[in-house]
Amino acid sequence: GPVIDQCFNPTTRRLQKSRVPIIAAVNGVAAGAGASIVMACDIAIAAPNASFIQAFSKIGLIPDAGGSWLLVERLGLARAMALAMTGDKLSAAQAKEWGMIWDVAEDCVAAAVAMAERLAVMPTRALTATRHLMRDAGSRTLDQQLDVERDTQSALGRTHDYFEGVKAFLDKRSPQFKGE
């Protein structure tokens, strides 16, 4: 009830609706809502000792914080169903192999910071648009997605960052994006 409505669900919704990419670093066990919140992030990097578990079935509950939707979205129905029903633990290596997380790194925090620094110098409007296109793709048909891609590409093709990216490529130098 109240904890789900006041804490977990608003957190998952905020992560899903964010304008900027969300990066998670996981060191240890991400259980229940913790695992769901990791899956709500755009990029997750885990330490080798990290694991993910949805053990709700072992105590007579169901996945929360979006877990029932996020597991299916990330892993597919068969894997999501088995994990939710058995409460089995998923290792970091298996989570990477199955597509739950992006990578496994000895120092997951340093790797997450490095990823954030890498994204910070990229064309932020394009990253935001890519994030929204990917997040919303499942609710559209292919024809609808093609139209949204066309419209988004057209808008981004008139930005400073696009012109800077093309010029930098032609000049054989690194681009200096401004988010404009």
What residue spans do the PLM features occupy?
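Left-handed beta-helix
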Residues: 33, 39-40
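Short glycine/proline-centered loop/turn elements that form peptide/ligand docking sites
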Residues: 32-33, 50-55, 108
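Conserved catalytic cores of soluble enzyme domains
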Residues: 16-24, 39, 49-100, 116-119
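C-terminal long alpha-helix characteristic of the crotonase
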Residues: 45-50, 96-147, 154-160, 176-180
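Gly/Ser-rich catalytic serine loop of serine hydrolases
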Residues: 24, 28-34
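Hydrophobic/aromatic residues within transmembrane alpha-helices
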Residues: 37-38, 95, 112, 169
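Glycine-rich phosphate-binding loop at the start of an alpha helix
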Residues: 5, 9, 32, 62-65, ...
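An acidic, glycine-rich surface segment that forms the CoA-thioester-binding/catalytic face
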Residues: 1-26, 74, 157
